[in-house]
A protein has these predicted regions:
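Conserved serine/cysteine hydrolase catalytic core
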Residues: 142-195, 205
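Catalytic histidine-centered segment of alpha/beta-hydrolase-like enzymes
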Residues: 209-218, 222
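Gly/Ala-rich beta-loop-alpha elbow adjacent to hydrolase catalytic centers
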Residues: 58-62, 66
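Conserved alpha/beta-hydrolase catalytic His-Asp/Glu region
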Residues: 93, 108-167
Length: 234
């Protein structure tokens, strides 16, 4: 079974290497980089064009893109797994505040350069539980430019995208929202998304993990992906 793995902001496809290494050969796990230079909807569509008919697994920003793809192209998405992701920001004022915050980050990246920006980004409390040796800092530096980072902030950020909460009831299963138990915000979001989609959706919580579940606990992430494939093929 084909599985397409989509990384989050500042990450490259290489972020999925620890998970892919733990998946069996019968799962054709393909990690892709997020295209740049396109709008949010067009980026999601481009991921589907590259990935084809598959189970899609997205982390954070990559998860928001995969959700958009699943809603727009249910014929392409055989199953959807979202790690530490949301459907966007429903409240207009909160969304505007997020756009302002992301614009500030973009200006900082343009002013300070990629190395300083990535160092600050990974020092956020959001990544407090992410071991430095699992962060993949060198891959992030090699796989990004200031232009790609600022485009992602200004065009692909949660403040820029159309919120998808109202479309969740249209999402066709299987759908699996995942969050680390130490990431309380996204635990709540996982349960809220599940409730919107329907009674057959049950979130998975990864014990002892924070926001970057796939980096902090690749073994548990691979195990839940193996289970998804088993459920689809049994």
């Amino acid at each position: 079974m084909r599985m397409v793995l989509v990384p989050g902001f500042t990450q490259t496809a290489a972020a999925w290497d620890p998970v892919r290494a733990r998946l069996p050969a019968e799962i054709e796990a393909v990690a892709v980089d997020v295209p740049t230079g396109l709008g949010f909807v067009e980026t999601a569509a481009a991921i589907g064009d590259v990935g084809g008919h598959a189970v899609y697994v997205g982390y954070s920003m990559g998860g928001r893109l995969c959700l958009r793809l699943a809603l727009d192209r249910p014929d392409v998405v055989r199953g959807l797994v979202l790690l530490s992701a949301s459907p966007g920001i429903a409240d207009d004022a909160e969304r505007a505040a997020r756009r302002e915050a992301d614009e500030k980050l973009a200006l900082e990246a343009e002013r300070d350069g990629i190395d300083a920006f990535l160092d600050r980004w990974l020092r956020q409390p959001l990544f407090a539980t992410l071991p430095p040796d699992a962060a993949g800092l060198e891959a992030r530096r090699a796989g990004n430019t200031v232009a790609t980072l600022t485009h992602a902030l200004r065009v692909l950020g949660a403040g820029a995208q159309e919120p998808l909460w109202d479309r969740l009831p249209d999402l066709e299963p299987p759908f699996l929202p995942v969050a680390g138990t130490l990431d309380e915000k996204y635990v709540d979001l996982a349960f809220e998304m599940a409730a919107r989609v329907g009674p057959d959706v049950h979130p998975v919580l990864c014990g002892g993990s924070g926001h970057a579940v796939h980096l902090e606990n690749p073994e548990a992430t691979a195990a839940l992906l193996r289970r998804v494939v088993h459920d689809l093929t049994s």
